[in-house]
Amino acid sequence: MTSSRIVRVSLAALIAAGLSNVLGAQSTFAGIALPSVAAERESAGARNVARPTIVLVHGAFADGTGWQHVIPILERDGYTVIAVQNALASLAGDVETTKRVIDAQQGPVVAVGHSYGGAVITGAAAGNANVKALVYIAAFAPEANEPVGAYNEKYPSALGSALKPDAAGFLYIDRAKFRDLFARDVSVTEASVMAAAQKPVIGTAFAASVRQAAWKTIPSWYVVAQEDRAINPELERFYAKRMGAKTTEIKSSHVPFISHPAEIARLIEQAASAAVK
């Protein structure tokens, strides 16, 4: 056999062996076992499945940009995050918008709702097997067919007197009272921007209800804002106890995700970790 023939045979054998190893469980280099491409893909797939997508749902008088302090923390820690933008023109419409976002995700989801957004995730996540955890932040958590504002008279807050309806029935917070009632532990500058950019909510949303309550079947976490003047903290404790939620209390105004973003991110990540065990 000529030397060129020997070289060609040797190369063919090496290529065949290399392909066999790549397609198999592992390959070797200098006697050291290396993971195959297939094994790497399996490992990457397992990591992706194990880390839920975080869907953040804003409340009334706000929009998805309110999560701007929490999102970078979650993303830094490897989570995919989506902040829903709801119209606040009807509870049913906001539930449907949020449901579409949740349904579009691949793999497990953690749904997080602030304030009125708690009612939204309660309806939107119901019946979705991919939603593994719910996180309520100073939020409404109604029963099925229970109006969002069912307990506002039993557990009154100072916010009611500061609400100003427009001709179409949408509610705004009096800007002169916004920081004191909604964000008193946020800087004056940031609270001023929040007041100027507040997104009004249709008043009838608080008389509306959801058809199913997701927290009945999905593990839930609840953050009570101890210094909340928009939703009575006692109402928050009532909701948390009723749903059997894992409860954390933070010395905060109505917006702890703005004034205490690291704590809120940590809680969301705890829920996410527990959800995939």
What kind of region is each of these model predictions?
Residues 49-91, 127-130:
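Conserved HGGG/HGGXW glycine-rich cap/lid loop of the alpha/beta-hydrolase fold
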Residues 112-117, 121:
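Gly/Ala-rich beta-loop-alpha elbow adjacent to hydrolase catalytic centers
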Residues 130-131, 135-175, 202-206, 239:
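Flexible "cap/lid" loop of the alpha/beta hydrolase fold
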